[in-house]
């Protein structure tokens, strides 16, 4: 039985911890904050509850597998999980609105044809067909297997090019391009373009620079569906934490790791802020790469021939500016769980989120409106909890500085499950103006919204704490994530900053891959 120290209690780290404990190892998790779940947090006040991280679960099979492999109780025995239908309602800049059914390609085709005009659904369906080819080519290497040693082969974009007719009638393939170029070339409708590009932005990608293979993101959502657990996504983190406890994983909260101990050329434990040390045979780090390098006192965890993160990578990942609304009046029975109100000027929004400007919000941003029909989100049926969010630059007036973010972190309590897991901040003029813009835009989804607001809470992102999106093939490997196995024996990396990237499903797979490497050896190539 090996001793394993896990740094951080995010979803990927807990997934690895549970699997390693079932394999017979003694696992101890050290988390600097007062609770678990990483980006999966919840804001609670006066009987209202709001998810402040991911609002929906895609690819639930990842967590079903995790719970089956770590115990006799399946996921649905500890979590009330249901499909969201429609998957989303989209309100476009011209006022057109369409509801897209969940996990039904034929239903989506019919809905788009019915609202956007004949041919729109077929163009979208054809696009998803090509996205499926990219998914089939990369599903195993970018989700189910450790990063290949010859990762360079993934630098070629797997999205199939449309054949183009060249000179003398000969057909030639279109050049590889960005997701934005795919939208312009294949979708031929600004509303379909908004549908595609807003999905990419929601995952943290700029469609103007993301490879065409980012097409797998809407394919994944529309193929495997959108799911919601009663109690919000935080309930999934709660269930995973409970599973870890049931498998004898030890958690220490308020425990900041300041150094990874090395002995005889391998990781041998961790040192905490209070000066205490915990010896270990293996260390699993669920933190950003630059923080991992700092814990190694400057030693690089990956070599020159490996996929390596950019030095300023955490300043490149956009955050989510969130406004929690407590509303008077019941939730209408026909209200969509998720509505996306699209930006009036998509180019201005992309410049505001991904440009080199001051990091402010554009005049009318794309706003995601979450209205779960969940009794656990509201004090009674005469009220409603609504969450608004928009992508913002990872710096500027709408992002909390690390110092401010730290001061808002929950205190360590006897039970990390108790109380709210996210803290609102005092509204500055910039935050108040941004919140007003989100509420104004959301009026397209909720008529009479302003008159129903009982109170609101503003939850800006913490600078440098957003997690990147899933790993993507193409662009010469520029969208891959560092490998889970580092160059230091006994040290592994888990979570959204490493292979296979960010997102709930990918975090769960990251935990599975790390556990597989530790249990089966570094030559393990994934479950067959």
Regions found by a protein language model. Give the residues of each.
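Helical element adjacent to the flavin cofactor pocket in flavoenzyme catalytic cores
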Residues: 216-267, 271
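N-terminal glycine-rich phosphate/pyrophosphate-binding loop and immediately adjacent elements
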Residues: 2-143
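C-terminal segments that line or cap access tunnels to active or ligand-binding sites in enzymes
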Residues: 327-464
